[in-house]
Design a protein with these regions (language model features):
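Noncatalytic alpha-helical scaffold of FAD-dependent oxidoreductases
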Residues: 1-175
């Protein structure tokens, strides 16, 4: 609904209206308490990057979400250019899909997201670690094939493993 309203709000022929950077890139900031739209239990964010030629797989992911009754208030689909040289860099040439997934009222949500994660790996994509809260650690090396390079940097910067996080423990990044 939000996506449709946002699309229809744009004037068809208006060319002389300037928006601030914040208005353009953060439209939800204009919606009072937008984060409460999913209720007390809230939502989780799931974001993947897929290679440019994986449009059929992108459609498959969207269809699985729709078939499961996953009605997301906000979805973002963007085309990525080339990624950068960081060993855990998320962007890659292709597509990124981000969705807000309600955490209640969807039976089988964990299994659905696990299957989506597996499909992402099958086509050479990855999940966005900054938004991930549930990915299986076994998938990480396939999504981030330069993980060993990152571990070398980690070992040099923190040989005593003093720096860690819940995510690092869950994904077995701490080593």
């Amino acid at each position: 609904v939000f996506n449709e309203a946002w699309y229809r709000k744009a004037p068809v022929r208006q060319r002389d209206h300037l928006q601030t950077i914040s208005q353009f890139f953060h439209p939800l900031d204009m919606v009072h308490h937008w984060n409460r739209v999913y209720g007390r239990s809230g939502f989780l964010q799931w974001q993947c990057a897929l290679p440019l030629d994986a449009t059929d797989d992108l459609r498959w992911i969207i269809t699985r979400l729709s078939d499961a009754g996953c009605s997301s208030f906000l979805n973002v689909l963007k085309r990525f250019g080339p990624g950068n040289d960081g060993p855990l860099s998320f962007p890659m040439a292709g597509w990124t899909l981000a969705i807000d997934v309600p955490t209640v009222g969807m039976a089988g949500l964990a299994a659905l997201l696990d299957r989506l994660d597996e499909r992402v790996v099958e086509v050479g994509g990855r999940l966005y670690l900054a938004k991930d809260s549930r990915m299986a650690p076994e998938l990480l090396p396939a999504m981030y094939p330069r993980l060993d390079e990152w571990r070398k940097v980690r070992d040099a910067a923190d040989p005593d493993r003093l720096l860690t996080s819940d995510q690092a423990r869950r994904l077995r990044l701490h080593g």
